[in-house]
Amino acid sequence: MPILSLSSTRNSVLTRIYDYLKALVQQVIVPNVEDDKSSKSTPFEKLEPAKQNHPQKDCCATEKDDLVDVSELFPKQNNKQLSLTSKSSVVPCALNLDNLETPFSIKIDNNGAVTTQLNLDEPILRGPSRGEPAKLQNDLISSPPLEESYINNDQYKALFPSNFLPITPVSSVITPASKKSIDESPLSDEVQGIADESSETLPYICHYCDARFRIRGYLTRHIKKHAKRKAYHCPFFDNSISQELRCHTSGGFSRRDTYKTHLKSRHFTYPEGVKPQDRNKSPGVCTQCGEHFSTSESWVENHIEAGSCKGLPEGYSEGIREKKKTSKMKMIKTSDGQTRFISSDESVSEPALQNKNCIEATVMQSKERPNDKIIPTKTEKNDFGIGTQWFERKQISRPTQTTQSRGPTEVQNLKEWSIISPPILSPQNASSVPQEYQSSRYTLHMDSPALSSASSALSPLSGDPITTTETNKSYPLDSEQSLLEPDKTEEDAINQSKESNMISINEMLQKQMDFELLGENHLKETQDYLALYKKAYGIEF
């Protein structure tokens, strides 16, 4: 009895183990009955359907990623940003040399020879051709429409306002916002001078180049560009030593900040190991006298500019005080009603002497200065046009001589005397400031009374003054005085000198603006460039 019970228990345990293993095998390996009926296939062919039905999982994927559909690498439809092409002001470059209208055209014949021609008779059209605006408009209209949500976006409204127009050379440069920023910018002197010279909002005029400015400080800084002698000069600059040992090339500076930077870097000694960016807060020693200072800024203001340094040259402190009194700008109104601002003597240059208003304003200022010692009287040739020479005025003492009535022989010799007209002054080798402008002492006394027949004979000596026996007055023989016009006034002589000078300047400018000559020069330069291009690259046009 016990033996039978044990055998039955063993059979039942084995049966259960077999059923468990069978169920486990069925779960791991799923048999396909139809595969047995079909034709035999390789093991690799059997694995392909299994791979398609059971794709491999990404080991880095999470449960959150499984919920989102993963898109392909390249989408089926183009999802480009439509805002880049819709209502865009940027037009693709489509330069057509055949339709390009320029004042200078180049043609190439069958033999490869290049011929050039100036289009002087044809008007130059600036901008797009006739059919181009309509084409651009059609391109903008035919652009794909944008979504309404994108159009209502604040960023889109800021980029493309309602009154949007394509960019033009004027609208892209000058806008209400950009004009305001240009007016307030302290770094654009040239823009300030170019913008709307006839506007009343630019009352400050440069008396050298007629540039206008809205703020007086801009004009003061602009005038320094015309200066021959800079506003600031290094007191330790020595021109006698060699160029390699000098602290600066010229020692002159137009701006105070560059002047102070030069002093701090070349004439102030810092401790070892101090970086350049930390020098403003670092102490140091004066190179000239050896005195110690907490900062370089205090050394410049309290030691150098105050004149307390022992190494400064003699008279440096007095020169600074005198400069503060005399270097301020002064407002002068000219005869045509314009307001001119004259600065110190450091801001005189050659172009100023060719300006009528500048001449008048300079003369008015020179007459009002208390210590009227120096005035520009002559200019030298300079490529940059700022080479004014300064000369001290010297009083010329002319002895007053009287002449008696001359005999018939002297009168006959006087008639044969050749009268030489004053030469035409050129803007390079002659002064545009006439001699009578230099001082009231040198004005022409041309208001002569009617000469009698006995006293009408003039002295043949050009150096002798003209006198009469009735009035006993002396008339100097200046270049503006003509022997045949004794009743000529001082104003007529001044106008004659100005007109002769302006005529020569106008003739010179007219020669420079000769279009045929400019075209020939342009043609020659183009031919040289084509020859060089052909030689370098071996390409013929």
Swiss-Prot record:
Q: Where are the zinc fingers (C2H2-type)?
A: 204-226, 232-267, 284-309
Chain positions covered by the region annotation II: 73-105
Does the record carry Repeat as a key word?
yes
Outline the segment boundaries, as ranges, of region: Disordered: 35-58, 452-497
Q: What is known of its domains?
A: The N-terminal inhibitory domain contains conserved sequence elements important for cytoplasmic retention (Region I) and proteolytic processing (Region II) of the protein. Region I is also required for ASI1/2/3-mediated negative regulation of transcription.
Something else the entry says is: Present with 6490 molecules/cell in log phase SD medium.
Any one cellular-component term (Gene Ontology): cytoplasm
Its quaternary organisation is: Interacts (via Region II) with SSY5; protease component of the SPS-sensor.
| Comp. bias regions, Polar residues | 465-482
For this entry, the protein name equals: Transcription factor STP2
Give start-end of the signal peptide.
Answer: none
Q: Where is the composition biased (Low complexity)?
A: 452-462
Show the segment(s) annotated as I: 13-32
According to its record, how does it sit in the membrane?
Peripheral membrane protein
Subcellular location field: Cell membrane; Nucleus
Question: What Gene Ontology molecular function terms does this protein carry?
Answer: DNA-binding transcription activator activity, RNA polymerase II-specific; DNA-binding transcription factor activity, RNA polymerase II-specific; RNA polymerase II cis-regulatory region sequence-specific DNA binding; zinc ion binding
A Pfam family of the record is zf-C2H2
Q: What does this protein do?
A: Transcription factor involved in the regulation of gene expression in response to extracellular amino acid levels. Synthesized as latent cytoplasmic precursor, which, upon a signal initiated by the plasma membrane SPS (SSY1-PTR3-SSY5) amino acid sensor system, becomes proteolytically activated and relocates to the nucleus, where it induces the expression of SPS-sensor-regulated genes, including the amino-acid permeases BAP2 and BAP3. Binding to promoters is facilitated by DAL81.
What post-translational modification does the entry describe?
Activated by the amino acid-induced proteolytic removal of an N-terminal inhibitory domain by serine protease SSY5, an intrinsic component of the SPS-sensor. Processing requires at least 2 components of the SCF(GRR1) ubiquitin ligase complex, namely the F-box protein GRR1 and the E2 enzyme CDC34, but does not depend on the proteasome. Processing is negatively regulated by the protein phosphatase 2A regulatory subunit RTS1.
Q: What species is given as this protein's source? A: Saccharomyces cerevisiae (strain ATCC 204508 / S288c)
